[in-house]
Amino acid sequence: MTGISRIGDKDSRNDTNNNGSSDVFANGLGVVRYGDLDTRGDAMIESSSTVFINNKQVSRIGDKDTRGDAIVEGSSDVLVN
């Protein structure tokens, strides 16, 4: 199980996830999902195949965006496969 990504978490290029769910939260922050964008405009293209929020797959620590940058920050206590 891996921590989910939230708005404000960073990737390996130090970009910040700035899009995510407006109504589902982890630790008070919106959850990042497949297709959500970071500050460079790169979309998440890797995500959980089994957990969905707002009909989109949930992104986790280690998942990558269109530039190939992996999420390096996330929730330490909200975990998914």
State each model region's role.
Residues 1-81:
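Intrinsically disordered, low-complexity proline/glycine-rich segments
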